[in-house]
Amino acid sequence: MSKQVGLIHSLKDGQSYMEIWPVRKELNAIFPEQRIIKATRFGIKVMPAVAAISVLTQMAFNNYDSLPQAIVVALFAISMPLQGMWWLGSRSNTKLPPALASWYRELHQKITETGFALEPVKARPRYKELAVILNRAFRQLDKTALERWF
C-alpha cells in the first residue's frame, strides 16, 4: 500500500469492501477475502455477546479478583471483528500485482465488449476495483464467457 490511511478510514473501507466483494465459491481458492468476510461477519454477531458474558459471569459469581482478566478477554473479543475490517480495508486499497492487474484488464475488456458501460480502466488498479469488476462480471456475463477464468 503506497498511501497511508487512518484507522477509521481503513475500517470504513473494510465495511464497504465487505459489501462489494462477490461471495462466490469460484473465488475461494484464489482469494482469502471470502473467508475473512465470513469470519468478520460472524465476529460482528457473536463477539459482543462473548465480551459481555466474560465480564458478567465474573460479576455474577462475585469473582472480582478475576475481573481484570475478563475485561482483557472482552476487549480482545470486541477487537476481533475490527481486525477483520481493518485487514479488508487495507487490502481494498492495495495495488494489484501484475498478474491480477492483467486479469482485471481482460475482464474489463470482456465486459465492455459485451456492450455494458463501465468506468474507464484504471492504470494501477486496486483490489477494490477488482471486486467491482468481478461483481459486474458475475452479474452480467454468461457462464461461457467466464469459463476461461473459472
From Swiss-Prot:
Under Pfam families, the record lists: DUF412 (PF04217)
Query: Key word Transmembrane present in the record?
Result: yes
Q: Does the keyword Transmembrane helix apply?
A: yes
Topological type in the membrane: Multi-pass membrane protein
Q: Which InterPro entries match?
A: UPF0208 (IPR007334)
The protein's location, in the record's own words, is: Cell inner membrane
Which UniProt keywords are present, listed alphabetically? Cell inner membrane, Cell membrane, Membrane, Transmembrane, Transmembrane helix
The transmembrane residues are: 42-62, 70-90
According to its record, what are the GO cellular component terms? Answer: plasma membrane
The family note in this entry says:
Belongs to the UPF0208 family.
Xref: HAMAP family:
UPF0208 (MF_01101)
Question: Which NCBIfam families does the UniProt entry name for this protein?
Answer: PRK01816.1
Name recorded for this polypeptide? UPF0208 membrane protein VIBHAR_02941
